[in-house]
Amino acid sequence: MITKDTLAEYKTYNDPYQVEKDYLQDLLLYNIYANSSNEMILKGGTAFAKFYNSDRFSEDLDFTLSEKVEKQEEFAKSIIRNAVERLEYRHSYKEEPHINDFGTVEAVILVEGPKFNGKASTVQQIRFEISTGKKLYLGSEAMPRNSVYADARPYVALVMKREEILAEKIRALMSLKRRHRERDLYDLYFFMGKDTHIDKDLIHKKLSEADIEPSLEGFGKAIDSIEGTWKSLEPMVQHRLEDFSYVSDFVEKRIHESGVF
């Protein structure tokens, strides 16, 4: 455990609240990967920030559970409980581990971290999401994480490959009932800017799983529908947020050139 003053010395993010959450995420990820070497594949914004150098902060811990695991719901719940129990900071559940209608095991914990001063506003909230029953087409990569924080131990995480991340982000963007799709557009912009391969067959498989019709027009409409929420990303990125028109034009051009739709 580290003190509030020690934590204040770290400048991993502009916002001290984000620094504290980043630290607590590393503690929890160590706890997970100390007990689970081959079953939990990290994805989502936290994976992008910690392993792919994205500058977008993410609050959640998002995983896909390996198909090889039997009794997936029970296994996912036990992984969350074991990781949380080993956390040295005082904590409680806001939402106990449970499975939702989409086959995702979720939980939300409240943590009194180094910056906690007795007020409810200083309690950290961390959400777990573990997708069950989902097919991983490209496997995963074992990637080491040497955290900058003094008492956060190094760990090796299994991380979803960039090409599959990109395919899942296209599916997420085109899932019109999904919240925070501006984050999906930003992540597409980030990975396309890194020349991540756009795999047509993989993208079509991912869309088919969600009963989404592959369509350039539908993709464009999905992007247009989030223009009003684009600026909500400003507190979450560490550099100046690019204009929506620039990002959307860039992503749509890459998709058009790839011949995906």
Where are the regions that the model predicts?
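Structured mid-to-C-terminal alpha-helical surface segments
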Residues: 1-40, 51-56, 66-261
